[in-house]
Amino acid sequence: MNLKFLTKLKISIPIPVFGTGCGVLGLSLSKVSLNLGKYASTLLKALEYRGYDSTGGVFQTKNMEVTLLKDVGAPSTLVKTLGIEEQAGKIFCGQVRWATFGTVTKKNAQPHIVKCKNFIYGAHNGNITNTRELKKFLLSEGHNVVSDNDGEMLVHTVEHYFDNELSKIASNEHFIPEKRRACMRQAIINASKKMVGSYAAVIVDPHTEMVYAIKAGSSLYFGIGEIDSNNFGLASSDLTAVLRFTKMLVNLREGEFVEYDQNNFNVYAFKDLKIKRPNQPDLIIKQGSKIEKKPVRSKLRAEDTELIPPFEYFMEQEIQAEIETSGKLIKLFQGGSNTGRRMVELLKRENIHEEMKDIGENILKKDDFQKQSKIFNKFNDSEKAAEFYRKVREEYTSIYDVLVTEGFEKKYFFSTDKNTFIDLLESHFDKKKLLIAKALDSISELSDVKQFQESIRNFLEIIDNSIKNNRNIYTIACGTSFHASKVAALFFNEIANLEIIPCLPGDFRGQYSKSLKDNDVIIGVSQSGETKDLIDIFNDVEDSGLKIKMIVLANNMNSTLGQEKSDVSIPIFCGPEIAVPATKSFINQITLFYYLAIKIAELKLENLKKENGSQDLIRELSRKLDQRYKSIEDIPKLIEDTIATSREGIEYISSKIYMEPSLHILATKMIGVAKEGALKIRETVLNHAEGGEASEFKHGPNTILGKNTVFGFKNVRKMIRYFNEILEKAFDLA
């Protein structure tokens, strides 16, 4: 889809993206580098989508010499005009800002250097909601607060408690590294109790050259690696920024912080933590405890987060990718890809399945690429691998012919570990290596299928229990995920004759939180798995003591919701999304909900059979279920055809109405799609747009119509007739 007409717009108003606004960075190198400014520029520009009303960075060289560069403006501009690109140094602390507390001024830009009681500096992303109270407190304690920015309040608050802790030890011990680090850790714990809000922060003590990255309700990622013969530790609000420098990641949970320099890191809890574990007692971690963690190689590749020609916009690229991502999710429904199943059958026939399975497991256990490559290449060089390749080439030509097609690894690798195996191919094209990598991927894919099917079984058990106890099922989500939940309510009602109640977190808290009962079910939907409002609801439900099961549908399974808060977590498998407007995740969410509705209908049918229900009814329900299972296979092709056939029409209509001041998208039943369409308009061109139930339009919204309102196509009667025909077809499918 060509979006070039949007370049005519000359709008400088930032798009507010609540929950993702602002981004923070902390990079520590093993030695002073002349390239630190270049690294910093790359990182800041990678975070530009999170905020661009101001940009800043602190660069520390040696002997505690620091340079602060910040101003109003976007990273893509300021990295040059501020001279960020030319900076040398050993430590970089940076931030891009979408303004919340404090107007858009240089003073309110981050990072902040403070020296009231002790010399530290830092920045944050998120919101400290008690900023005014903190400012009064800090001023009363003698701090020199120069802005209204909540990031400055955070840095001063840490400084305040850091000074308190240092005052408890002898003055001649203040600069003993171990003592000083212990004081800073306790300061972070104490400061976190004083501050209210959701944030991620980076704090630097220039004396010890230690960096502290704190995850308190906002996304934060940490990785270690080497660049230009320089070891480093890197914290960022954005995963893709870290992946540009390293694939070795350390998973941080909400409530944890990491203390690190270029060579070492340690993770601590700044509050008491209770971690859910499947089929095990909850893991209890006490405040201040050190948490043992090892770096793990990311399953994502940097290429997965890059704009690939001919696309000019991430949103355009991700819309096109819906064909592939929905197809890969559907393959999970079907028990795996055809190529994967055929490969595993071949491995079993040739009696090397177990050996290949062991090789794959050993590769995935290693956190170092060189060690992984050594295992892979050892088997590749073996006589057994040569014999396997010969047999495939001579006796399994259908597999071999597919193997040598262009872009095979992009089209036919499906497992969550696929990028690990693709990386092992390195840059040169080797058919034997490709065959081995595909074999490993196929084994891993079937493992994914088993895990997915187990999650679905657990989901159905929970839903079945809720139905038998006549209890409520709530879906709770924000933004695009909420709109997908509205579509889910339609699917569950039409297909499974089951009511679910879709809620925004605020509505749930106000309308349902006090009336929950045992055997109710909460289904949280989140692309990131880090949606703070949703995490708060899950925490409240858990604290209630009621016997309520909590389910999560998430894209990022290594997340707070995916790993720590849910009884069952189900992946949506849409891959990374870079564009702020969610596209792939919405399609995969509603595809997954459609499948879950079918599975619940199937469950009800099985119960009806056990109860010796009407045979005519059973046959009719079975026929409908078969139709729906077949309709799932058509989804990727339907998306592909829709993109192809509507391209010109969308471009034409968009070019005509993108400057209209107000748009209304009306729906009958499919209100979730209408609301999502309106959100996409607001996110991309900043128009006012609303999506709503068509019958409600006359009850208020029509009062704002005027002579400049766009009502629709010229031939309204013809449009309505076609629209009704489309609706009839849609409802036959639904």
Give the location of each predicted region.
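Short, solvent-exposed amphipathic alpha-helical segments in soluble enzyme
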Residues: 42-45, 111, 218-220, 227-229, ...
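Acidic catalytic cores of enzymes that act on phosphate-bearing nucleotides/polynucleotides
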Residues: 654-726
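Structural motif
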Residues: 91, 120, 472-474, 521, ...
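Glycine-rich phosphate-binding loops that contact phosphosugars or nucleotide phosphates
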Residues: 361, 374, 380-381, 387-418, ...
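Internal, active-site/partner-interface "lid" segment
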Residues: 154, 169-173, 182-186, 601-648, ...
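Conserved short alpha-helical segments that host acidic/polar catalytic motifs at enzyme active sites
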Residues: 5-471, 642-646
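A structural-propensity feature for long, helix-poor, extended segments
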Residues: 162-166, 175-178, 247-248, 255, ...
